Amino acid sequence: MEKIQDKKTGEVVFYKKHESGLNIYIMPRKGYTSYHAIFGTKYGSVDSEFVVPGEKEVTKVPDGIAHYLEHKMFDQPDGSNVFDKFSAYGGEANAFTSFNMTAYLFSCTGNFEKNLETLMDYVQSPYFTPESVKKEQGIIGQEIRMYDDNAGWRVFFNFLGLLYNNNPVKLDIAGTVDSIAEIDSELLYKCYNTFYNLSNMTLFVTGDFDAEKILEVVETNIKNNVPFTEEIKRIYPNEPKAVAGKFKEQTITVATPMFMMGWKDNDTGYSGRKLLKKSIEMEIITEMIFGKSSAIYNELYDEGLINQNFGFEYSPHIDYAYTAIEGESKDPKVVYEKITDYVDSLRKNGLDREDFERIKKVIWGDYIRSFNDIEGYSHSFLTMSMLDISYFDYFEEYEKITFEDISKRFEEQFDNNYSVLSVINPK
């Protein structure tokens, strides 16, 4: 195993690239009473068109199939329930599908090795029958209809639909009732055999244990030792720079109007340290201009235009990225106008160097504290590894960032020609 150490914090993670292609990260945490493991594949809702390694034909699958596959992974040939197995060992299991990743995870305070064996066993043991796949359509169809009436979900996907013309990130992760009706067991196996090949997967485990012993458990439970010899070719449509629309509103049962506004980032197409540096720069910038100490936050709050539910984030990915602001307001359009005017004034007058120095220290503090949240850290580590980023490279990239870098990045990112507003109004 390779020992990787964070030069600033001293935290250590052990890494091994298994002969199966599986990326294994083991992070011992002395004195911690809980354990966590997350087993993920670089496969999400946007991966609906691809070429399987060794094939020439393009495979196009229905929208929502990655999420559907995640649901079906819990089926067992003997009819048992995976969650019951975890419960028997005191483990709490879960899974999720995002745009770019599917992950299976558990937390426990004991029986870590038994829970880890259970995780590795079921994720490597697909069992799909035509009958069970058909049955799931009704369950997921109900879930889709439920999200159709979920204001938080709709304000978000309407926002993405305004930002993106063609990129599949604008499509609901679960698909539509019509698209999932096209899914059968044969398609599920094809997607599983393509994207759940261990060369496309990463396992991250953390807790108070001996790293060598845990590696032995992992290697003993690896079932498929045949990695792909070539990359999975993922096919995404070309995305123009322009946004698809500027404004969309929808009416749903909510107490107060909800909004999500933001800016499309057209600086995409790369991963690794370059993406990490941009992400840290955007963390600093968004906190500087929208955080609770910012002029615009206090103006909006004092005027009663926002409440405590105001939030913001920068979402970095290889093929798409955006900055989003969300909240509740009696007048979302006024909030949008005030924020975009504020951004224009900052573009004209420049950012504040003292704000930069202060917020940069705040962001570093957030990074240090992230190590205390085992589940959050595990999720972040896995997500970053799939973007070819090492969590432990954070400090080196953080140290490089200057006020000039921040100013340049702000100019690039906050062009109101690429801003949009999504609103949910009460019925």
What residue ranges belong to the model's regions?
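Charge-rich, well-structured scaffold segments of protease-associated domains
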Residues: 76, 81-233, 272-277, 286, ...
